[in-house]
Amino acid sequence: PYQNAANVTTFLAPGTAGKVLTTQGAGAAPTWETPAAGISLSADNTWTGTQSFTGSTSKLAEVLTNAGEVCTISATAATGTINFDVTTQSVLYYTSNASANWTVNFRGSSGTSLNTLMSVDQSVTVAFMVTQGSTAYYNNAVTIDGSSVTPKYQGGTAFAAGNASSIDTYVYTIIKTGSAAFTVLASRTQFK
């Protein structure tokens, strides 16, 4: 139903599959139209811009029955400074044995800082999976956009060693608390 120009409640005929209801302004009947810009409600869609689903105090903003995350798998050994671009993947998996302790640097991408990408009060959670050989190494420093950050570690103790002949999975939750200000929660789990 909608309120027409004479303030009379009027009912609209049912729509056709694949159409969306579009307002025509106050007092005018809404119309069923094909979605603009090639967006189809019954086909796969890709968005490159930010989509906001705000929900309310009594409704969830988003409910997912299933979802996939992008995982970058690389035959690379963890060592030196590793740039983790959060716009590229949620999970980064290095399949060659780590060869030294490393720094992980979180950023949006090579051209966008994490500080620019995120708004205050937003968080992102990512995982870095590191293959370990008989000599194990560990993540000994964290930076965001090249600036040092001291994480808060699960259990309260910073990483001091890796786990030999395993896959160590590091999970980081990064919370933006202010301009270029972040809280990082870090944990590590051994898989063998």
Named regions from a protein language model:
Residues Y2-S58, N66, D85-T88, S96-W102, ...:
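Extracellular repetitive beta-rich solenoid segments
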Residues L60-Y93:
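Predominantly extracellular/luminal regions of secreted and cell-surface proteins
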